[in-house]
Amino acid sequence: MTSTRKSVLTSSSTITVTTCLLLVGLAAAGYASEGGEGAHHVDTAKQMKDFAWRCLDFAVLLAIVVWALKKANVKGSLAERQSNIEKMLKEAVEAKEQAEKKFLEYNEKLEQANKEIEAMSAAMKQEGELEKVRIIAEAKAAAEKVKEQAQQAAHQEILKARIELRDEAARLAVEIAEKKIKENITKNDQDKLVGDYISKVVTLH
């Protein structure tokens, strides 16, 4: 849906710029032909009327440019991008919280395992020394394995969340940068068209 809206806005901006160019071209052609005739017929009333029509044409062109800028809905598009970034940040924070929650669960299991080891150690005091050492070693190895698995799982979850956040943030930053560049170019083109039109009006008078 976002890509479709972006295409519609781009097409609308292109059509608007093309229309403005056509209007400027037609106005310039009309002014050039009228300027040639004015060299042979000097009429103050006619010149004032011609000047009034040119001012009206300029006002119409300016209104079209303002309408096109409003139609593009630039602020709405940027607000939508910002909303998407905030949503991704929120999801990344939630993923991190889930990873930390799992890490705490693994720590609780580890503490429970340590308690069981202590209970086993107390029970084995009555058994032979060699057997006791062997069982304790196995229990410690199992506890270390659980701890290592818990740390790896939590680390992987956090790393995954960071990578997804970084990639999405980079992608959205590029899209926003491209959007801003396109908007600046469109605005400069429109400013140039208005400036050229004013220059032609001043030159003809």
UniProtKB/Swiss-Prot annotation:
Entry keyword annotation includes Transport: yes
Molecular functions (GO terms): proton-transporting ATP synthase activity, rotational mechanism
GO-annotated cellular components: plasma membrane; proton-transporting ATP synthase complex
Top-level taxon in the UniProt lineage: Bacteria
Keywords carried by this UniProt record: ATP synthesis, Cell inner membrane, Cell membrane, CF(0), Hydrogen ion transport, Ion transport, Membrane, Transmembrane, Transmembrane helix, Transport
Pfam family, one: ATP-synt_B
Alphabetized CDD domains for the sequence: ATP-synt_Fo_b
Protein topology in the membrane: Single-pass membrane protein
Spans through the membrane: 51-69
Subunit note: F-type ATPases have 2 components, F(1) - the catalytic core - and F(0) - the membrane proton channel. F(1) has five subunits: alpha(3), beta(3), gamma(1), delta(1), epsilon(1). F(0) has three main subunits: a(1), b(2) and c(10-14). The alpha and beta chains form an alternating ring which encloses part of the gamma chain. F(1) is attached to F(0) by a central stalk formed by the gamma and epsilon chains, while a peripheral stalk is formed by the delta and b chains.
Function, in words: F(1)F(0) ATP synthase produces ATP from ADP in the presence of a proton or sodium gradient. F-type ATPases consist of two structural domains, F(1) containing the extramembraneous catalytic core and F(0) containing the membrane proton channel, linked together by a central stalk and a peripheral stalk. During catalysis, ATP synthesis in the catalytic domain of F(1) is coupled via a rotary mechanism of the central stalk subunits to proton translocation. Component of the F(0) channel, it forms part of the peripheral stalk, linking F(1) to F(0).
Family as reported in the entry's similarity comment: Belongs to the ATPase B chain family.
Name of the protein this chain belongs to: ATP synthase subunit b
